[in-house]
Swiss-Prot record:
<protein>
    <recommendedName>
        <fullName>UPF0371 protein CD630_08980</fullName>
    </recommendedName>
</protein>
<comment type="similarity">
    <text>Belongs to the UPF0371 family.</text>
</comment>
<dbReference type="InterPro" id="IPR014999">
    <property type="entry name" value="DUF1846"/>
</dbReference>
<dbReference type="Pfam" id="PF20921">
    <property type="entry name" value="DUF1846_C"/>
</dbReference>
<dbReference type="InterPro" id="IPR048441">
    <property type="entry name" value="DUF1846_C"/>
</dbReference>
<dbReference type="Pfam" id="PF08903">
    <property type="entry name" value="DUF1846"/>
</dbReference>
<dbReference type="InterPro" id="IPR048496">
    <property type="entry name" value="DUF1846_N"/>
</dbReference>
Amino acid sequence: MKVGFDHKKYLEEQSKYILERVNNFDKLYLEFGGKLMGDLHAKRVLPGFDENAKIKVLQHMKEKVEVVICVYAGDIERNKIRGDFGITYDMEVLRLIDDLRGYELDVNSVVITRFEGQPATTVFINKLERRGIKVYKHYPTKGYPSDVETIVSDEGYGANEYIETTKPIVVVTAPGPNSGKLGTCLSQLYHENKRGNVVGYSKFETFPVWNVPVKHPLNIAYEAATVDLKDVNMIDSFHLETYGEMSVNYNRDLELFPVLKKIIEKITGKESIFQSPTDMGVNRVGFGIIDDEVIRKASIEEIIRRYFKTACEYKKGQVDKGAYDRMKMIMEELNLKPEDRNVVLPARNYSNKLKESADKNDTCPVVALELEDGTILTGKGSDLMNGTAAVVLNAIKHLANISDDMHLISPVILEPIINLKTKTLASRNVSLSCQEVLTALSICAVTNPTAQFAMEKLALLKGCQAHSTTILNRDDEQTFRKLGIDVTCDPEYPSQNLYYS
């Protein structure tokens, strides 16, 4: 993999800049946008970026940091899913707490935002409190967003519970967007100022990158990742007017800035130190870029991946037509085609070839996988195993120089697994999944050195690209994610079945 980003340089620059910002205050409330850990988007568009870079920045100064996690009550109520992990937001909060503790960071509390007594949220609050987690309840802010007098009063932010904090940097994070992080920070600013404390607010958001051109593929990839939120990159007009410098921000921050500035000035009783949304940020990711061409190429590849993701989400009814149309416009703007992704045509061509001799209704699912050296392998779905399992076996055989006709998994192992699945557990989906096949392979590896040698090649699949001619089920998606394979799918279901697919 060609590296375009210097992780070490970024870590030093980012830590230093946050500490400089906190020096102006007794306490800094730092709103963390995007993902605190496992930022796979940043890792893909910035080759060399550590997916856990942001939490490592905090770990550098852990003695000065405590974390508050926000979650919107409505997201818990409707079981909102974090797409990349396939878990609900309430479970993501628990995972986040465990991970933060793993990095030796203090988790202060969980804040339930816009709480209106929702039953499922109340159950979640009880669960947290009975595990010893402090929970605060914040309510819909009266007068928000335009009535500043009411917002900055005992009826507005004053109605929220004050979060007791002890460290100079309070990181406010969340499982996903629109969770109430900004509202929580401003509510705390209100309460802290009433107590006579000198506190500040800043925002740590990786994308868009403020010191990279607005039409750079890196920033366009951010638009592609947020088509459902209707985020649009724009020149920060406030920054340009004040400093005469070009800077990039997104529409929501620019639209909100005048009101936000008024709220901060009303809370503090003095003129804001921020003259633009860019001023509010502490993001230094742009200074870690060391090879612009590598970043451009990686970002373009990400945009095509996002096109397939949006197309599949539209097929599943998870996004509206507007989001899908915006995604197509982004592709057209950069003169990109889905087929520009190397693994797409090999998968489709093999599937079409299989269809020539198959039943009319057979979708002939195929998965293609590109290895680091550019070799593209394919795997087809069968009665024995699905396409994801087949292509992974073919890939590790190729990497281990094992003959294609040699069986890695003994029928003695496979038959009991298939019988368990079909007869004992009465599953209608007979084909073994990728994880089931890898489990069978690991059992064979105990007595078969060839299987063991092939298994050792699984680590080489990290960073590989794959494409499926049909939508993968969640289990196979997650297995590919754990293997580090970036997979896209054509927006077609593998069968006519609505549930058993």
